[in-house]
């Protein structure tokens, strides 16, 4: 009698042995440049560098402009005669942080030149903006700008004479003043700076504060071609003949990504492919009954995640010291504090009840893996083992915003800090809606999901309810209402208000802003005082605006500037919570409103309670394109 099990085992063994001999001759004819450029290299104290940077022995592996000098602690490259230090290379988040060498702790270098960075290779991130230095100016002294920041530098006569540093030089409101200033100055130099670092000068306008802004450096993104090339197992390089990016692959160079092997290799390996398919089918058939942990169809979505660390569950237990330090609990799981082996503090979210639905995990990892922004929490890795699911992201020292909006701690944050937090959240949402290749709609914006670092820089977190859609699209189809009561847009509940879209996040943001300044919380007091449960929430906000009572929880003791900021936040919040999505501004417009002057902000139209089954009318021109947006599903809804 034939032992079928033994026969199958021996057959599989023979097949594997045969493949070990066939594969090397069939598919491992690797292009030497792919082998040469795949490893990273060290420069000074910095490790793991690759494209666009290159050292003398790796010329074909980088862009010609970015040859680095490794004689010091930091990698340094030169554009024309201008040198830049590479402060940080973060390939996980795809961020490069640079600083102009001659401006390190020096505002008045000798005859600086105006040189720009090729943004086709290293594009500016959303947090990067241009500042301008004006040197040897002969015109009248300029002390202030209505729509920006200007500071006289005090350079020596032989170096720079009467000189200035200006932020937001491209703002239309500054054009007349700066055109005159530029004409009277001998030299103008544009310097990229960090927008979030520049915000610190609002409270500290000293020259030392400007130096610190420059020393922090500015952030650039990676060339998207290189990211796609690496994801396809290629190595990034530069074609000297065509003067263009090239992806070195195992078979031959390609323009963007590694595609299929050549026809000859494909024909030679066709039989091997058929054999592999047969073996896989046999293994699947015999293993199906013997395992209880099957991969769900939606799990395959994680195969598209690249350059992310995948941790085992044992590693997660070690990182969190057996889950000994609980940071918080939510509807999707528990968050624990921990430390990576390099000492970095992290937060680890363990998703609960994964067996019932894995879409929350897929949503969060797929959404966060596509983001890289100062106001979006950084994803560092994930665990995907059996039924265990965990997400590892950066640790934020000040926790979530909601604890600072409670009665006990509300006075700890002044108007200026709350404004910076609200502006940062707006920029983060603007990035999700308009800055990513695939638009991300969060659907759960609330104080508990806004994390704060040690400088109270806000970061949007918790993407468990997020949806992805193509940028050209706007309308999402939802099979279930999602979000938190009090922050959910009305169209999520009822189609009479309009279609669900990224404008649903705008509504949640408006409720968040009103809560931050105390306007939302006062609803309870007003309703209780009037003994009416039918009063429409914004009614009393409009009444207070008409009566000039717009300081909310801050009282009358705050300064005139802070009162204007509180009123601006109120108006922006009211625009955001308009019942019809068509009447809400998009997030990029909200950022402009928050950054702009209060004088140009109009009081939004006062909505009325609308019970008709007809859609609400459009009251403003804030609506974006009318093309229908189809949802890009990242997980099965079954």
UniProtKB/Swiss-Prot annotation:
Residues 321-609 form the Protein kinase domain. ATP binds at residues 327-335, 349. The modification Phosphotyrosine is found at residue 393. It is an enzyme of class 2 (transferase). The chain crosses the membrane at residues 265-285. This is LEAF RUST 10 DISEASE-RESISTANCE LOCUS RECEPTOR-LIKE PROTEIN KINASE-like 2.1. Residues 286-638 are cytoplasmic. The keyword Magnesium does not apply. Residues 30-264 are extracellular. Keywords: ATP-binding, Glycoprotein, Kinase, Membrane, Nucleotide-binding, Phosphoprotein, Receptor, Serine/threonine-protein kinase, Signal, Transferase, Transmembrane, Transmembrane helix. It catalyses: L-seryl-[protein] + ATP = O-phospho-L-seryl-[protein] + ADP + H(+); L-threonyl-[protein] + ATP = O-phospho-L-threonyl-[protein] + ADP + H(+). InterPro entries: Kinase-like_dom_sf, LRK10/LRL21-25-like, Prot_kinase_dom, Protein_kinase_ATP_BS, Ser-Thr/Tyr_kinase_cat_dom, Ser/Thr_kinase_AS, WAK_assoc_C, WAK_GUB. It comes from Arabidopsis thaliana (Mouse-ear cress). It holds the Pfam family WAK_assoc. The active site is at 444 (proton acceptor). Belongs to the protein kinase superfamily. Ser/Thr protein kinase family. Its main location: membrane. GO terms for cellular component: membrane.
């Amino acid at each position: 009698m034939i032992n079928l099990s033994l026969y199958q085992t021996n057959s599989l063994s023979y097949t594997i042995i045969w493949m070990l001999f066939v594969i090397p001759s069939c598919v491992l004819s690797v292009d030497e440049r792919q082998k040469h450029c795949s490893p990273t290299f060290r420069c000074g104290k910095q490790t793991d560098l690759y494209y666009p940077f290159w050292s003398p022995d790796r010329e074909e592996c980088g862009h010609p402009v970015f040859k680095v000098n490794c004689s010091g602690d930091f990698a340094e490259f030169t554009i024309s005669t201008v040198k830049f230090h590479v402060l940080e290379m973060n390939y996980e988040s795809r961020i490069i942080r640079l600083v102009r060498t001659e401006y390190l702790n020096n505002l008045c270098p000798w005859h600086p030149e105006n040189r720009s960075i090729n943004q086709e290779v290293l594009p500016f991130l959303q947090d990067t903006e241009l500042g301008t230095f004006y040197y040897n100016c002969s015109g009248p002294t300029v002390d202030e700008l209505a729509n920006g920041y200007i500071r006289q530098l005090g350079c020596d006569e032989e170096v720079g004479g009467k000189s200035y540093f200006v932020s937001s030089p491209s703002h239309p409101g500054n054009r007349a003043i700066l055109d005159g200033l530029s004409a009277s100055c001998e030299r103008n130099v544009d310097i990229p700076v960090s927008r979030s670092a520049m915000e610190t000068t609002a409270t500290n306008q000293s020259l030392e504060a400007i130096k610190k802004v420059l020393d922090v450096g500015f952030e650039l993104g990676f060339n998207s071609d290189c990211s796609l090339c690496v994801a396809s197992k290629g190595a990034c390089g530069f074609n000297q003949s065509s003067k263009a990016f090239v992806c070195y692959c195992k078979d031959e160079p390609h323009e963007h990504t590694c595609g299929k092997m050549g026809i000859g290799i494909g024909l030679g390996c066709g039989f091997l492919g058929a054999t592999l398919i047969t073996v896989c089918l046999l293994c699947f058939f015999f293993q199906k009954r013997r395992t209880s942990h099957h991969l769900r169809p939606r799990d395959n979505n994680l195969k598209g995640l690249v350059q992310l660390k995948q941790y085992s569950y044992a590693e997660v237990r070690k990182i969190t010291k057996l889950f000994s330090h609980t940071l918080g609990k939510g509807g999707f799981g528990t968050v624990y504090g921990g430390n990576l082996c390099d000492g970095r503090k992290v937060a680890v979210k363990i998703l609960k009840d994964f067996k019932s639905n894995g879409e929350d995990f897929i949503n969060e990892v797929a959404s966060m893996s596509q983001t890289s922004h100062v106001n979006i929490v950084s994803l560092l890795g994930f665990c995907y083992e059996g039924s265990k699911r965990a997400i590892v992201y950066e640790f934020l020292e000040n926790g979530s915003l909601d604890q600072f909006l409670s009665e006990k701690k509300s006075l700890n944050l002044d108007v200026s800090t709350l404004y910076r937090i609200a502006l940062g959240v707006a920029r983060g949402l603007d990035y999700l809606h308009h800055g990513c290749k695939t638009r991300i709609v969060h659907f759960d914006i609330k104080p508990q999901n806004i994390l704060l670092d040690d400088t109270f820089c806000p970061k949007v977190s918790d993407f468990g309810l997020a949806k992805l859609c193509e940028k050209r699209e706007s309308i999402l189809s939802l099979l279930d209402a999602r979000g938190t009561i009090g922050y959910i847009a009305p169209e999520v509940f009822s189609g009479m208000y309009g279609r669900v879209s990224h404008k649903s996040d705008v509504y949640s943001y408006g409720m968040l802003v009103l809560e931050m300044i105390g306007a939302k919380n006062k609803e309870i007091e007003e309703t209780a005082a009037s003994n009416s449960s039918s009063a429409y929430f914004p009614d009393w906000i409009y009444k207070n605006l008409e009566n000039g009572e717009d300081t909310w929880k801050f009282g009358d003791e705050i300064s005139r500037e802070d009162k204007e900021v509180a009123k601006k936040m109120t108006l922006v919040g009211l625009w955001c919570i308009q019942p019809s999505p068509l009447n809400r501004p998009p997030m990029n417009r909200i950022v402009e409103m928050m950054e702009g002057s209060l004088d140009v902000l109009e009081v939004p139209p006062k909505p009325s309670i609308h019970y008709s089954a007809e859609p609400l009318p459009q009251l403003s021109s804030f609506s974006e394109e009318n093309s229908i947006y189809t949802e890009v599903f990242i997980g099965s809804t079954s």
